Amino acid sequence: LAEVADVLAQPGVGACQTRVRIRNRTRLLAFVQDIEFACIADAGQSWRNRVGSVGLGGNGQYTRLSTLALLGRAPWSSCLVEDVELGIRLHLAGIGIRYTQRAVTSQQAVTDIRRLLRQRSRWAQGNFQCGRYIRKLMASREVTSLGLLDFLQYLLMPWLAVPLSIVIAVVLGCTIVFSLLGD
């Protein structure tokens, strides 16, 4: 908590996201999620630290009470990813969010594929809900150009994943068919 306190003591910072590690990573599905959080999410959040678009998500997020009070009597919404939405609203309000690798929060991973798919479906659906902030992010003077690009790719990816997957599958299929016909 000392590292989080140091981050929150920085001027203009109202929230902090810590690194997340998976505690029960002895099973393959949990191990893969640990790689996702410890490597991929860590690299993304470290980059976001530089461009000013650190996101809040799940465990390991800390927000000052005074920061939450700035958002009114009900700072959290009914959004499925209320943590992500809170981070977006803080950015729009010009409140800094920082990421720290030094403080680590551990959590249990979902070890059943059905539960993992349900969890990730909820996350994607929540990102759809956060799409309503795209116009505000684009118009905001509080969000940097690189930060905006990061927000856009994050919020638009659920919308683009299926169509892009179909396009890639068609191109790959055509490539295979044409290569077989050419022999």
Enumerate the predicted regions with their spans.
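Short, solvent-exposed loop/turn segments at secondary-structure junctions
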Residues: L68, T105, A161-V162
